[in-house]
């Protein structure tokens, strides 16, 4: 993987990630394909929304179908028939979200399989091995996602363990002679001094890119913005920056304003299945009775298959009848909406009018532009 920083405006960055499997224009949003599928979509449909890179889930694909089935096909690209690059998370967050059914030790994490209750152990080395078998173009280190809230001491202990696991991940990745990219993950909760320690340790180990982890786990938005403003300027300028598990459309804009290049989130797909659809002016809840007789498209500005062919009335009808097509059409629209936002951000950066884009983005939602700490 090669990263090229093409242009900057303030902290916002316009760049390119070059992989053997294709080029990804940044800032980029990655749809989430947890089990080797973006729910309800064929790979061609996902590509049709403008997505150039997908996220796969190491933890879930390890439990089902498992490494052996993956190797029978070649790798995850062959298994799911996605021709572009794939980033896989390390499984750290999924293990973290198992709650009381897991036990974290210095070696790794002991837990019971959510599939069949079997006792399972995962560590940095195992995560690297699974991601190697998946053929991931971007491999994430195995880390511990610091919960929120956490005391300074709890966040410190968690962050220090993540650093040791990062080193083990790096060593195993190098031992495999894996030709792909390995990203480090900055932890430290909402504490700036801990983020400093994490950044320093990770940059010393050396990675192909750096993720900011442990955000969007329940902390106030102001804390997320503060940590990004503090952390991003310390990360190497010539490496991509990835904000994990984020987020709402405004979170993408705010992340880019603070120097982030890559995002992923289940929100566009999950919300689509629940009938919450993103449009230029905000959100439409297609379930609401007022859409029953509305023959207009979801968003007159949207060029997606759904908006070009169907009315709100039809989508309301499909939702009320729990038709699979409704979830599919909604997902196509939401994924395209997210890709349109990213394309608009990239164009605005190319044309040196990103600040104007931000003002217009919030004006259409009748909201104030959130404050940004001076450079």
Curated annotation (Swiss-Prot):
Gene3D superfamilies: Queuine tRNA-ribosyltransferase-like (3.20.20.105). Binds 1 zinc ion per subunit. One of its GO terms (cellular component) is cytosol. It catalyses: 7-aminomethyl-7-carbaguanine + guanosine(34) in tRNA = 7-aminomethyl-7-carbaguanosine(34) in tRNA + guanine. Substrate binds at residues 89-93, 143, 187, 214. Its EC number is 2.4.2.29. Coiled coil: none annotated. Residues 245-251, 269-273 are annotated as: RNA binding. One of its GO terms (biological process) is queuosine biosynthetic process. Pfam families: TGT (PF01702). Zn(2+) binds at residues 302, 304, 307, 333. Keywords: Glycosyltransferase, Metal-binding, Queuosine biosynthesis, Transferase, tRNA processing, Zinc. Pathway: tRNA modification; tRNA-queuosine biosynthesis. Its cofactor is Zn(2+). Catalyzes the base-exchange of a guanine (G) residue with the queuine precursor 7-aminomethyl-7-deazaguanine (PreQ1) at position 34 (anticodon wobble position) in tRNAs with GU(N) anticodons (tRNA-Asp, -Asn, -His and -Tyr). Catalysis occurs through a double-displacement mechanism. The nucleophile active site attacks the C1' of nucleotide 34 to detach the guanine base from the RNA, forming a covalent enzyme-RNA intermediate. The proton acceptor active site deprotonates the incoming PreQ1, allowing a nucleophilic attack on the C1' of the ribose to form the product. Belongs to the queuine tRNA-ribosyltransferase family. Homodimer. Within each dimer, one monomer is responsible for RNA recognition and catalysis, while the other monomer binds to the replacement base PreQ1. This is Queuine tRNA-ribosyltransferase. It comes from Aliivibrio fischeri (strain ATCC 700601 / ES114) (Vibrio fischeri). The gene is tgt.
């Amino acid at each position: 993987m090669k990263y090229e920083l093409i242009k900057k405006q303030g902290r916002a960055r316009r760049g390119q990630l070059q992989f053997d499997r294709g080029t990804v224009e940044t800032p980029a949003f990655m749809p989430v394909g947890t089990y080797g599928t973006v729910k309800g979509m064929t790979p061609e449909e996902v590509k049709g929304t403008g997505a150039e890179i997908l996220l796969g889930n190491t933890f879930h694909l390890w439990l089902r179908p498992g490494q052996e089935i993956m190797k029978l096909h070649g790798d995850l690209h062959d298994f799911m028939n996605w021709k572009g690059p794939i980033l896989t998370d390390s499984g750290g967050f999924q293990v973290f979200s198992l709650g009381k059914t897991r036990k974290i030790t210095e070696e790794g994490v002991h837990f019971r399989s959510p599939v069949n209750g079997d006792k399972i152990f995962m560590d940095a080395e195992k995560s690297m091995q699974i991601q190697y078998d998946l053929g991931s173009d971007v491999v994430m280190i195995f880390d511990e996602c610091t919960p929120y809230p956490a005391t300074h001491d709890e966040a410190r202990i968690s962050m220090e363990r993540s650093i040791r696991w990062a080193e083990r991940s790096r060593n195993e990745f190098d031992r495999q002679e894996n030709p792909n990219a390995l990203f480090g993950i900055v932890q430290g909760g909402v504490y700036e001094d801990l983020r400093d320690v994490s950044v320093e340790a990770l940059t010393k180990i050396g990675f192909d890119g750096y993720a900011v982890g442990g955000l969007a786990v329940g902390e106030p938005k102001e804390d997320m913005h503060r940590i990004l403003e503090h952390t991003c300027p310390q990360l190497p300028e010539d490496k991509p920056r990835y904000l994990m598990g984020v987020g709402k459309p405004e979170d993408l804009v705010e992340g880019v304003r603070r120097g982030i290049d890559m995002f992923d989130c289940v929100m566009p797909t999950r919300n689509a299945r629940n009938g919450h659809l993103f449009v230029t002016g905000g959100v439409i809840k297609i379930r609401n009775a007022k859409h029953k007789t509305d023959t207009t498209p979801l968003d007159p500005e949207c060029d997606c298959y759904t908006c070009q062919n169907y009315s709100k009335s039809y989508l309301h009808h499909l939702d009320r009848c729990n038709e699979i097509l409704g979830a599919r059409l909604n997902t196509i629209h939401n994924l395209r909406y997210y890709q349109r936002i990213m394309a608009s951000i990239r164009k605005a950066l190319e044309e040196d009018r990103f600040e104007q884009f931000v003002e217009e983005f919030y004006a259409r939602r009748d909201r104030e532009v959130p404050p940004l700490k001076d450079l």
